[in-house]
Amino acid sequence: MTVRTRFAPSPTGELHLGSIRTALYSWLFARKNNGEFILRIEDTDEERIKKISINNIIETMKLLGLNWDHGPYFQTKKLEKYNIIAKEMIYSGIAYKCYCSKNRINNLRIMQINKGEKPKYDGFCRNIEEKNIKNKRFVVRFSNPKNGYVIFNDLIRGTLKFKNSELDDLIILRSNKIPTYNFCSVIDDHDMNISHVIRGEDHINNTPRQINIFKALKIKCPKYAHISMILDKDRKKLSKKNQSTDVMKYIKNGFLPEALLNYLVRLGWSYGNQEIFNIDEMKKLFNLKSVGKSSCIFDINKLLWINQYYIQKLSDYDISSQIKKFFNKKEIDFNQGPKIENLIKIFKKKSRTLKEIFNQILFFYEDFSKVNFDLIKKYFTIDTNVHLKIFCKKLEKTSLWSVEEIKNTFFCTIKELNFNIKKIAMPIRIILSGSEHSPSIYSIIYSCGKLQTIKKIKIAIKFINDNKKKLNL
């Protein structure tokens, strides 16, 4: 049997972390078994579908490297086929037209709830005489078996059993001729020869309904595996209200695709105590038997730790290529400042995302006027400009550019002025980085370069002279 899996998102919003984990598990299962992976867009819900979401799905999958073998297929391209099959089901007696009004359905629901019963359609139109009904809108319902059980082996959860008496006659075709999710899913899984359906546990209740449709149509049913939900730290369903769930936002904020995949694959699956997996290891080691049943807790700090690991593995050049995208987005000319790779060498060590690196080096390319005035008031005095000019002159005279030469320039300056190094080092740190917290001042100056350092100090001197009153100096 050829393994064929599918990822079938509905483009109604951003691509959720949980959705990408589902896609990843389906993709890995196909790759592990030399099978095929299909991308299917379930876009029949016209009122909720967003074109931008379709583009988001495709772009995100590409960025993550989750390449598909077939697709993307769109359900809206098959509306005619769904309608033809629905008519055939009516003709063969496994589906029927339902003329019940919304008012009747609502009243039925209220009555059942008041009786303590589970709300479901009562089959009123199953045997209705159609000859007395003319020009009335209808939906098409599946004739679900009234007796017996639906029993199937979930590849993660084991044997699951459902009473048919608890399943109602679900709608397969709306009054506007648009097919519903469960119906489309069955037809598409059959047409695409899907062998394994891997999806979230929120779909478990859909599975017996789909299995009954498969059986009624006398077509082969795929195997099912339902993965656990992802919860937040309070053990509530992960949602954008309390934690960003949009995968694309994580990528745009400097999370690496390989880090996201590594984190998500471990969110429910394990291989011993190993935490770090490259994509080839995932394809080799992944199996559904090692996927847990329990819900998983999303831990942003764990994701940041993994992302930091992958950042350290990247070359300075590769990081620089990514950082330049942040500059371009802000329309800042990075060619007017220090070489980005030089700054990356000293700032990447403690950075957990590419965005953190960018934020730390941004000021090196901005005008000194954007500095936090509180820092100037805290560390600059009326004599600071004099100290900076002396330091600048000594720096200009250096013949070799090295960390040792920079240290020597500081030593000569503080010896001449007879004060603590902080009086000159902190102002220079703020002039170059815009922050009072940064790596070694010697490393910063060395990475910034001689000409850029002198240029920025002179600009700062002029700015401070022009704004003495404003700065209370």
Swiss-Prot record:
It catalyses: tRNA(Glu) + L-glutamate + ATP = L-glutamyl-tRNA(Glu) + AMP + diphosphate. CDD domains: GluRS_core (cd00808). One of its GO terms (cellular component) is cytosol. It is found in: Cytoplasm. A motif ('KMSKS' region) lies at residues 237-241. Pfam families: Anticodon_2, tRNA-synt_1c. A motif ('HIGH' region) lies at residues 9-19. GO terms for molecular function: ATP binding; glutamate-tRNA ligase activity; tRNA binding; zinc ion binding. It is an enzyme of class 6 (ligase). Gene3D superfamilies: 1.10.10.350, HUPs (3.40.50.620). ATP binds at residue 240. Its EC number is 6.1.1.17. GO terms for biological process: glutamyl-tRNA aminoacylation. The keyword Protease does not apply. Keywords: Aminoacyl-tRNA synthetase, ATP-binding, Cytoplasm, Ligase, Nucleotide-binding, Protein biosynthesis. Its main location: cytoplasm. NCBIfam families: gltX_bact. Catalyzes the attachment of glutamate to tRNA(Glu) in a two-step reaction: glutamate is first activated by ATP to form Glu-AMP and then transferred to the acceptor end of tRNA(Glu). Belongs to the class-I aminoacyl-tRNA synthetase family. Glutamate--tRNA ligase type 1 subfamily. Monomer. This is Glutamate--tRNA ligase. The lineage of its organism: Bacteria, Pseudomonadati, Pseudomonadota, Gammaproteobacteria, Enterobacterales. The gene is gltX.
